[in-house]
Swiss-Prot record:
Signal peptide: none annotated. Keywords: Cytoplasm, Methyltransferase, RNA-binding, rRNA processing, S-adenosyl-L-methionine, Transferase. This is Ribosomal RNA small subunit methyltransferase A. GO terms for cellular component: cytoplasm. It comes from the Bacteria. It is an enzyme of class 2 (transferase). It comes from Rickettsia canadensis (strain McKiel). The lineage of its organism: Bacteria, Pseudomonadati, Pseudomonadota, Alphaproteobacteria, Rickettsiales. Belongs to the class I-like SAM-binding methyltransferase superfamily. rRNA adenine N(6)-methyltransferase family. RsmA subfamily. It catalyses: adenosine(1518)/adenosine(1519) in 16S rRNA + 4 S-adenosyl-L-methionine = N(6)-dimethyladenosine(1518)/N(6)-dimethyladenosine(1519) in 16S rRNA + 4 S-adenosyl-L-homocysteine + 4 H(+). Specifically dimethylates two adjacent adenosines (A1518 and A1519) in the loop of a conserved hairpin near the 3'-end of 16S rRNA in the 30S particle. May play a critical role in biogenesis of 30S subunits. It is found in: Cytoplasm.
Length: 270
């Protein structure tokens, strides 16, 4: 029988390292709750980034997935994870930097991602995975609360920005619940939150999303400017294009919906 999450880490003399942005979760009930809101189905193929002390890993494995692949860059955790594997042979362990691996490298046709992501690489991983959304069933992620609010933000709100647009064009986004700093060891300085992203059935092309990224970069660089001014250097976007698309050219970047940005991008590419 495996020891408790905290005791398991202690037996291996593992303490959190600040350079890796590590904050351990020892509360198994929280781990179970994260997996529960993911609606993970049996026989799914699952990916977890940064399993660390293995709390979330255990909760995922208890749902009997076909396989769980964990990617861990800190070699101190590998012996601990191998001990979990003795009880769950469907656990695959890869020692690697998650930023150096694409989903296609792992041979997935479909994968469910459940992770407590290190804060310092969370945004980059989310954007990268969204561009591989055709391979993803859903992503249930723990991130900084502020980042989750940006992902889920609606137009004309302070948190709304490029990340909101890109995420919502590719996935249905849902803020599930917040997590207090006291749930971690050591406690971080900020609140966290769980967000679930489920890729849409009709996904925009990568080329179209890339064009949206270019347009939103210009638009939100001057988010208080009128859209006709902030996009004036984006040659294809003339005022008549905005009129044709029924977009008020006196709007600011934060007033346009994700679909507005998609239409502008599509018009430029046509």
């Amino acid at each position: 029988m495996l020891p408790s999450i905290a005791k398991h880490a202690a037996l291996h003399h593992i303490n959190p390292l600040k350079k890796h942005g590590q904050n351990f979760i020892f509360d198994s009930s929280l781990c179970h709750k994260i997996v529960r809101v993911s609606n993970l189905e049996e026989n799914s193929r699952v990916l977890e980034i940064g399993p660390g002390s293995g709390g979330l890993t255990r909760s995922i494995l208890q749902k009997n997935p076909e396989s769980l692949t964990v990617i861990e860059t800190d070699e101190r955790f590998i012996p601990l994870l191998n001990e979990i594997k003795e009880y769950y042979p469907n656990l695959n362990i890869i020692k690697q930097d998650a930023l150096k691996i694409n989903l296609t490298d792992l041979g997935y046709d479909k994968v469910t991602i459940i992770s407590n992501l290190p804060y310092h690489i969370g945004t980059e991983l989310v954007i990268r995975w969204l561009k591989e959304a055709r391979l993803i069933t859903s992503m249930t992620l723990m991130l900084q609360k502020e980042l989750v609010e940006r992902i889920c933000a609606m137009p004309s709100t302070k948190a709304y920005g490029r990340l909101s647009v890109i995420c919502q064009l590719i996935a249905k986004v849902e803020k599930c619940f917040e997590v207090a700093p006291t749930a971690f060891y050591p406690p971080p300085k900020v609140y966290s939150a769980i967000v679930k992203l489920t890729p849409l059935e009709n996904l925009p092309s990568i080329a179209l999303i890339t064009k949206v990224e270019q347009i939103t970069k210009l638009a939100f660089a001057g988010r208080r400017k009128m859209i006709k001014s902030s996009l004036k250097n984006f040659v294809p976007v003339k005022n008549e294009v905005l009129t044709q698309l029924n977009i008020n050219d006196n709007y600011r970047a934060e007033n346009l919906t994700p679909q507005d940005y998609l239409m502008i991008a599509a018009c430029e590419m046509s």
